[in-house]
A protein has these predicted regions:
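Short, acidic, metal-binding catalytic loop of nucleotide-sugar glycosyltransferases
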Residues: 25-35
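N-proximal low-complexity "stem/linker" segments adjacent to membrane-targeting elements
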Residues: 1-27
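Conserved donor NDP-sugar-binding/catalytic core segment of glycosyltransferases
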Residues: 104-131
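A conserved acidic beta->alpha catalytic loop
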Residues: 42-51, 94
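Acidic donor-binding/catalytic loop of UDP-sugar-dependent glycosyltransferases
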Residues: 48, 97-109
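Short aromatic/hydrophobic "clamp" motif used to bind/position activated sugar donors
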Residues: 90
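Conserved nucleotide-sugar donor-binding catalytic segment
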Residues: 138-216
Length: 216
């Protein structure tokens, strides 16, 4: 990858059904903005998943970088991806979610003079679970899942991601956003170009507890 790559897309994967991972990868590859690298961090998947990921990475070697390490969790995997990225901007996609084809170009248009943006999502709930969760800061208030802060809703300049590492544990994404707000120009935007599939088995994000989702 050349140093002038515009966007680094990071994806941490751990034993998610490869059909979902393939959907996520394909949604990145078909972006209408093509100056990106996709860094897949394999967080210790099974042999079957590892082989599938390697085959895909080899097929698209001009776009995909594959990194593997023993199971460390999503936060540490994303941190490693940040260290290996060369893009001017960084964003994240979960292995069972997907982008609309204009996601990267929309984020680039929106960020303008900001240093980090957090976008709304288009949430697809795969069970009969509710679309609403309690606000961590006000438990009497319900917020829509589309409004919550997730790894994949963050898009920003590399210096923001290099300044703060993600902390392991629940709500690492929201915690990162709150810390970034103290030092950088941050804005929430209404894009809905990130498709969040909720309640997919074995997703790294599937264990996020509702009480840790917050609205900022």
């Amino acid at each position: 990858m050349l140093n002038q790559t515009k966007v680094s897309v990071l994806m941490a994967v751990y034993n998610t059904d490869f059909s979902y991972v393939k959907r996520a990868i394909d949604s990145v590859l078909i972006q209408d903005f093509q100056d990106f690298e996709l860094i897949i961090i394999d967080d210790g998947s099974t042999v079957t998943n590892r082989e599938s990921l390697l085959q895909y990475a080899e097929k698209y070697e001009n776009k995909i970088i594959y990194i593997r390490h023993s199971n460390r969790g999503q936060a540490e995997s994303i941190n490693r991806g940040i260290l290996n990225s060369v893009g001017e901007f960084i964003t994240i996609i979960d292995g069972d979610d997907e982008y609309k084809s204009n996601h990267l170009s929309s984020c680039l248009r929106e960020i303008k003079e900001e240093e980090l943006i957090c976008s709304t999502t288009e949430t697809i709930v795969d069970t009969n679970d509710d679309f609403f969760v309690p606000d961590k800061n006000d438990l009497t208030k319900l917020i829509h899942l589309d409004e919550t802060i997730l790894f994949g809703t963050l898009f920003g300049r590399k210096k923001v991601f290099s300044s703060f590492s993600f902390k392991s544990g629940f709500a690492a994404d929201a915690d990162f956003y709150e810390r970034a707000k103290t030092q950088f120009r941050v804005k929430k935007v209404d894009l809905r170009t990130y498709i969040y599939h909720r309640n997919i088995p074995n997703s790294i994000c599937s264990t996020i507890k509702k009480e840790n989702l917050i609205n900022s």
